[in-house]
């Protein structure tokens, strides 16, 4: 299972890459494998605001429809619109071109609620 060290993680299998007061958010390798082939992605609008753990996107796969939850509260600065035409990028490159949104962090203290790569890897061992 691919768990990059430079990211933080949630128990719902989202990742976040923080850069100053902004961050990229996506779903983990584990999540995309569990979902199967992604066939549709519903993304929020730029300037939409979400609280921590609030659903902000929907991934539809051949197996299921799944909500994606924001690891920390924030305002959407950019949505990865390439996924609207190529939803399979979530499967192919979940940590690169398969990212979902870029957000402006509302409260950096919420990052303390997230798991490091080591903690997430241990968590995956428990759930598998």
Swiss-Prot record:
NCBIfam families for the chain: gcvH (TIGR00527), PRK01202.1 (NF002270)
Organism: Halothermothrix orenii (strain H 168 / OCM 544 / DSM 9562)
Listed InterPro entries: Biotin_lipoyl, GCV_H, GCV_H/Fam206, GCV_H_sub, Single_hybrid_motif
Lineage of the organism: Bacteria, Bacillati, Bacillota, Clostridia, Halanaerobiales
Protein's UniProt name: Glycine cleavage system H protein
Keywords: Lipoyl
Coiled-coil portions: none
Role description: The glycine cleavage system catalyzes the degradation of glycine. The H protein shuttles the methylamine group of glycine from the P protein to the T protein.
Any one GO BP annotation for this protein: glycine decarboxylation via glycine cleavage system
Recorded GO CC terms: cytoplasm; glycine cleavage complex
